[in-house]
Structure formats: structure tokens, C-alpha cells
Amino acid sequence: MMEKNKRVLLGMSGGTDSSVAAMLLLEAGYEVTGVTFRFYEFNGSTEYLEDARALAARLGIGHITYDARKVFQEQIIDYFIDEYMSGHTPVPCTLCNNQLKWPLLAKIADEMGIFYLATGHYVRKQWVDGNYYIAPAEDVDKDQSFFLWGLRQEILQRMLLPMGGMTKSEARAYAAGRGFEKVSKKKDSIGVCFCPLDYRSFLKKCLCDESGDKNRNIYRKVERGRFLDESGNFIAWHEGYPFYTIGQRRGLGIQLNRAVFVKEIHPETNEVVLASLKSLEKSEMWLKDWNIVDESRLLGCDDVIVKIRYRKQENHCSVTITPEGLLHIRLHEPLSAIAEGQAAAFYKDGLLLGGGIITMSDQR
């Protein structure tokens, strides 16, 4: 078994959070090595690489760069596209953290003989009744626990999370107070790293640009389709079903005398059903690909909280396992716009119990 020494491998993005994490780990007496992953470079910019290298040099810590663009394309971006083509609403940041970023960090650390792993995530870790749990950050506005429900004990036991007890404003002040003015003023990243502004523009570029990478067979013809009401009556034409998500109201390109929202997406017919917000409420859902730290804390309990969106929509629920191996969630109060492909995360007593991917939901 690897010795638990004071060496730690830190994921460094070049941003404020991972930079401050490096400083905090050094102050705590750790020997820090930084690794910057090349996952995706928006508009081809590599400024983040130079920023991470420069910070590592200034702090006097080791630094390496790891090119993961191919695996990121295959596991994250292609999944993202495939999910929308299936009429689902993916959460790529959840998949990336649980199946790529943290496992890759562990793999590199193993090769270097390093036990501890760290990032600039705003989360905490707790040891309760023989298990490690992720816990929400002190800064509720920056808390990222929702994205980490898929991590297992072999990763959790190695994690160091120096940002969990700090707010973002405190992190900026901390960096500025130590002479890292540029670090303290870096902008926050917003949204998905490979399409931070609008996923529809990204999808259209991937799906509809015949001049794209034909070796990857990304180009797929997307034609206009029909908006229907709940009775199957034609309302208007739409641009193509992949460009809509469950619960969407804005950007439909139609004007009606009532508010309507996307209720159903049918890839096989290229039809999108619109309905009132009330009609989107559901009181049940099922999860696949789930991970739970300790099932006894979740199953049969009525005080579990489930979240289906980062920072939004939480409710109390009860959870059982179906004969098919899915998690069946019964909500105490209906939630609106539950979409297949989204993630759901469970919380209880201030701990992240686990989560899974929504595979289907029923009407109230």
C-alpha cells in the first residue's frame, strides 16, 4: 500500500481557486506537485497553461501538463452530443469529475508515488461511521458537491479539499494579501467548459457543419420538426429536437397568448410537445448508474433531500431499489421539468450520500 506521506498532486487550472489551493497546501506543510489537464481549449486559448506554469514556478512547486483532449472528446463531448441526439439533458461536469478528472488525477499520482489528491473544488470531506463523505462547502453559492456524487471510497480517502471552508471573496483576498494580485482578479468560469455561453450554438456547429471532422462522424443532418400541444395538435415549426430541453420556455421562437414549456422530446419523430408549467410536474423518477456511500443512510428514510439541478430544485424524498436495479425516488412534493439524462444527488445530515442519472420519470 502506498505510504501516506505529505506529498499531494493538485489539479491546477490556472484559475483563482486551484491557485489558492496550492498556497494553502504549502502553508499546511505539503509537498505539492501541480498538474494541468488539457481537456478542451475554448477558442484555442492556452493562456491557462502559461498561468499555471508561472504560478507553480513562483511558488517553487513541481508542475506537469497532461494532454487529455482525446479522451475528453470521446468520453465527455461525444457523450454530450449523443445525449442531446437522444432527446436527453446531459450533465457533462458530473461525468467529467466522476469518471475522468478525479480518476485521472489518481492514476497520475499513483505513477508518481503520491497518495494525496487535491483540487480547488468548493467542497468538504467528512469521516462518519467508517466512511468518507463529501459535504457541502462553507460558501453555499460556490458549493460544488452536486457534481461529485459518483466518487468512491478509494478516491475519497485520498482527497484534500483546502477550499471547502473558504468563501470566494475570502479566496480572492487571501491571494491578494500574499502578493498574487493577478490570481485574485481572475474571472470565474461559467457553465460547461467547452460551451460556456450557449450549448445550442456548440451543438449546431458539431451537428450541422459538414466541414467538421468527418473522421469522427460527428456531422448529422438535423431538420426542422413540429411543436405539438398535449393533444397532438400542430402549433409551429421548430429548428430540430436536439436544440430544446425539458422545461425550456425561452428561445422557442414562437408567440402564443399563454406561457408554454417543453414537456416532451421525441427524437424518433422530431417532435417537441409544449405544455403549461403545471403539466411538467412529476412526483416520481428512476435513476441508473447510481452510487451510494452507505445504503442504510438512504433507503427507507423520509428525511433525505434530493437535488436535480446544481443550486436548484431540491425536495424531500424516499428511495427504494427496484428489481431491475434502478433507484426509485418518490418525491414528497412534485418537481417541475425533471429530464432524462440529468443528475440527481442525495443529501442528509449535511452529507452527500450519492446520486445517479435520471433514466425516466412518471406523471404525477
UniProtKB/Swiss-Prot annotation:
Q: Which UniProt keywords apply?
A: ATP-binding, Cytoplasm, Disulfide bond, Nucleotide-binding, RNA-binding, Transferase, tRNA processing, tRNA-binding
For the ligand (ATP), the binding residues are 11-18, 37, 120
As its record notes, the protein acts as a catalyst of: S-sulfanyl-L-cysteinyl-[protein] + uridine(34) in tRNA + AH2 + ATP = 2-thiouridine(34) in tRNA + L-cysteinyl-[protein] + A + AMP + diphosphate + H(+)
| GO CC annotation | cytoplasm
Tell me which residues this entry annotates as catalytic: 96, 193
Show which residues form the site (Interaction with tRNA). 121, 342
Q: Which domain of life is it from?
A: Bacteria
Cell location: Cytoplasm
Query: What InterPro entries is this protein classified in?
Result: MnmA-like, MnmA-like_C, MnmA-like_central, MnmA-like_central_sf, Rhodanese-like_dom, Rossmann-like_a/b/a_fold
Keyword presence, Oxidoreductase: no
The Gene Ontology biological process terms listed for this entry are: tRNA wobble position uridine thiolation
S-S pairs: 96-193
Q: What general EC class does the enzyme of this chain belong to?
A: transferase
List the EC numbers from the record.
Answer: 2.8.1.13
Q: Which GO terms describe its molecular function?
A: ATP binding; tRNA binding; tRNA-uridine 2-sulfurtransferase activity
- Any Pfam family hit: tRNA_Me_trans_M
Does the record carry Nucleotide-binding as a key word? yes
Residues covered by region (Interaction with tRNA): 142-144, 309-310
Q: Which family does it belong to?
A: Belongs to the MnmA/TRMU family.
Q: Describe its function.
A: Catalyzes the 2-thiolation of uridine at the wobble position (U34) of tRNA, leading to the formation of s(2)U34.
Q: What is this protein called?
A: tRNA-specific 2-thiouridylase MnmA 1
